[in-house]
Design a protein with these regions (language model features):
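C-terminal catalytic core of tyrosine-transesterase DNA break-rejoin enzymes
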Residues: 114
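Vicinal oxygen chelate
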Residues: 1-8, 16-17, 23-78, 82-111, ...
């Protein structure tokens, strides 16, 4: 079983470029263009994780259009500090600097140009059961 988030982007082609450059995601699978010729569906992968994206149309709103974020993604990576440096260099808006958490992860938070919040983490210690 797995979960595949579906994120909404006004500029799907721009999201593909940014997410690749900043977060290391790779284009995966088929893309689809709308009647206007613009890309309106794509999928990307980070390791074994798949993330799909599409144009929101009139029925839905992405964080940019809504004016706030309603969810975030939490993704485990091998080297969170190296990942942070890449995201920062690529122009991601940094929400949280890398920090160690009480639950045994080192993580940072970033926001993409359309307002989606991404948290990347690395396990640094096994968490203790309560």
């Amino acid at each position: 079983m797995s979960i595949t988030p579906y994120l909404l982007y006004e500029d799907v082609a721009g999201a593909l470029k940014f997410l690749s450059k900043a977060f290391g995601l790779k284009k995966s699978g088929q893309t689809m263009k709308g009647a206007d010729g613009k890309l309106n569906h794509a999928a990307m992968q980070l390791g074994d994780d798949l993330i799909m994206m599409g144009y929101p149309g009139k029925k839905y709103k992405n964080p940019k259009r809504l004016g706030q974020s309603t969810q975030s993604l939490y993704i485990n990576v091998d080297d969170v500090d190296k990942h942070f440096a890449r995201a920062k260099k690529a122009g991601a808006k940094i929400l949280e600097q890398p920090q160690d958490t009480f639950y045994g992860h080192r993580r940072y938070g970033a926001e993409d140009p359309e307002g989606h919040q991404w948290y990347f983490a690395q396990e640094i210690a096994k968490s203790q059961k309560a």
